[in-house]
Amino acid sequence: MPHFIVECSDNIREEADLPGLFAKVNPTLAATGIFPLAGIRSRVHWVDTWQMADGQHDYASVHMTLKIGAGRSLESRQQAGEMLFELIKTHFAALMESRLLALSFEIEELHPTLNFKQNNVHALFK
């Protein structure tokens, strides 16, 4: 953990530069000191069928979720979230100026007991 998951409307696939966003998100999350680098995973789910608002324009949307394990303070989660959303807004600023675009971001804390995982990548970063 954490997992940074993007749901993005397919009409901005080229302009969104999600590999570029992920290249910024992963080290930013690691730099907080509360997320181990080996557990950070970023991915996108492209949405090819959607409707926004009245459906009368070429709207685009990007919804992002950061799924994290339980146990971090509200203050540290809020600081990480605010820092990450600033990075997100900067990444999408030019696109926001050129088209109708909705950005949203949330942090989801997973249940401390009902969260199962195994990862041998952590050993590479010890």
UniProtKB/Swiss-Prot annotation:
pH dependence: Optimum pH is 7.6.
Keyword set, alphabetical order: Aromatic hydrocarbons catabolism, Isomerase
Biological pathway: Aromatic compound metabolism; 4-hydroxyphenylacetate degradation; pyruvate and succinate semialdehyde from 4-hydroxyphenylacetate: step 4/7
Residues of the active site: P2
Keyword Isomerase: yes
Catalytic activity: (2E,4Z)-5-hydroxypenta-2,4-diene-1,2,5-tricarboxylate = (3E,5R)-5-carboxy-2-oxohept-3-enedioate
InterPro entries: 5-COMe_2-OHmuconate_Isoase (IPR004220), Tautomerase/MIF_sf (IPR014347)
Signal sequence, renumbered to the chain: none
EC nos: 5.3.3.10
One Pfam family this sequence matches: CHMI
GO biological process: catabolic process
Highest taxon of source: Bacteria
GO molecular function: 5-carboxymethyl-2-hydroxymuconate delta-isomerase activity
Assembly and oligomerization: Homotrimer.
Function: Transforms 5-carboxymethyl-2-hydroxy-muconic acid (CHM) into 5-oxo-pent-3-ene-1,2,5-tricarboxylic acid (OPET).
Entry protein name: 5-carboxymethyl-2-hydroxymuconate Delta-isomerase
